[in-house]
Amino acid sequence: MEFDISGAKIFARIPTGIPVLGDILITETLVVSWIVMLIITGLCIFLTRNLKVEKISKRQAVAEMIVEAATNLVRNNTGGTKFDNLIPFVSTIFATSIVSNLISLIPIFRSPTADLSTEASWAILVFIMITANKIKAGGLLGYMKGFTEPIPVMTPFNILSELATPVSMACRHFGNILSGIVINGLIYAALAIASGALLGLLPGAVGDFLSHIPILSVGLPAILSVYFDWFTGAMQAFIFTMLTIMYIANAAEG
């Protein structure tokens, strides 16, 4: 039995004719990311249809609970309503992250977060918002001066520290999700091989038939999937969201 853990598949290449840019790749990560966006958009449309002030539906009640949870998450970690403008951005990051992590529960889909480019794009957006808030709080000159503190010789280290923020956010999330996929894949493949070897010891046609059925692969991979996909996926989405809130809030405070 073969089990591919080599990475996202490339479905198509679109030549750009520009040597620097190379070809535009339509990858498995890109396609599944579109599916994730469609799922989130569909849920938003479904939950926000026919909104009412009184006698609200169960669907609207769920929508209000989600909005209230997102609002409380931001306000409880920033000390008030000052950063309410972050709520839509933070909610989008969390929703995209958790759906991307959990979509791998469907066997035909590979989680987009198992591709570093996904987390890197999120981290770049967060980094831009952090930098914009720092400049807004202290001005451009104040932002540049901050790299020379407490003494000018620390400037290279301060620059590295600034760049390390998006890198660490992206790599932390990516590493946890990818490791789960790799471990699941290795265990599934190992159990399939063990199943074929053990059942192949049975005499006659029965052993020959059962050796081609990965019986041992049923059960344990599913249990591991509950941990790596559900628990770790939800936890990493929460951690990335919390770091986003704290970094941007701290930047705005100067």
Where are these regions (language model features)?
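Selective transmembrane helix interface/packing segments
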Residues: M1-G254
